[in-house]
Amino acid sequence: EVARVEAAIEQARAGKSCAIVSSGDPGIYAMAGLVFETCKIKGIVIVPPRSDPKGTDDSNVLRLEVVPGIPALCAGAALLGAPLTHDFAAISLSDLLTPWELIEQRLEAAARSDFVIVLYNPKSKKRNWQLGKARQIILRHRDKNTPVGIVARAMREEQNIDIVTLDNLHTAEVDMQTTVFIGSSTSSKYLDFMFTPRGYAKKYEIKS
């Protein structure tokens, strides 16, 4: 990733138009943050694409635009039904750049606060134990029958969708292209879908 960003910045500083392509949304567990971080470290001035930075050395100015995409949590949620209608937290289980101790703290806090929890990067060939540990942490605060949505390769031809219980999460087939949606205490499985109510039925009369 670092090599890609540095190559793109070098081309852009040479006067060329350059794009860095990420899957999903470039600002969610993707490359946009690294671009900003690299520019800050190198002291490169960043401005919006249609601005005119007067009084600045143009060789040290990059016109940068972040184009939004559809993140995996939005695509996966749409395929499952409506699991993110209420408050939620997204947590990556990859400890390559974040210490596992910090990830555990975030899992504990999100589970204790009854957020719907969206897990990115749940498992890889070299990281095969983190999802099981996350399940153990969340089970301290959630019923074992809490619905869990499993979406692999969302919106692609080979996509796969499944809904299991939190108790059986460790048996689910997941990989780095899978997003895991762990329901809150109010989330439900209805037919082949999963949803989290916003609370309308408690405040308003909805006739059966």
Name each model-derived stretch:
Residues 22-25:
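Glycine-rich beta-strand-to-loop/alpha-helix junction loops that act as flexible
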